[in-house]
């Protein structure tokens, strides 16, 4: 009997330690989750340099988050987010719906690459939309006994100081770089009572693609001045 009691105490201690580590080391969990599950959302490689998250304050920071380019495109990566600041309500970290007060993304660098009849960002956005749809279907199945995915409500998301490089295979690795207008999104998931992480990512990706398209169409003269010799026709092809 004593051996069983000792064994039970040891098991409880191990479980307790696991729960403690899981809660205290959210930074490790988030980094692994981004790099392991991220490719299933974006359809590309995902890498993150460093993650810092405090479960007590709810403040977090991601550095050097990189989204790879889809197959068939030549640029090294589609996007790099050097600095991402998070502010989460710590009381909701273990809740079914996590309340994110703010997300700030400073100085991202994005590559807008044309390939055939589409662009790399459109390919990534479609992958995110498809994953978001599957997540929604899985969430709706929760009433049938399937565990629901955690959802998020994001009060404010701000992307500022971004740069976009527009290129294509015809430009042989070179392109035209221009400023990305600031993007501000509010109340993501509020109307729906929360959205999954992939749904939130899809909303943000579509907002970025739309803003880039708007910027391209309103700055044709700027684009004509850049690139390599003979690249005007290639640049025209990017905005068709």
Summary of predicted features, one role per range:
Residues 1-43, 228-230, 237:
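N-terminal type II signal-anchor transmembrane helix
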Residues 9-21, 31, 45, 67, ...:
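A near-ubiquitous, low-amplitude feature marking generic local secondary-structure context
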Residues 28, 56-59, 75-80:
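Generic alpha-helical scaffold signal
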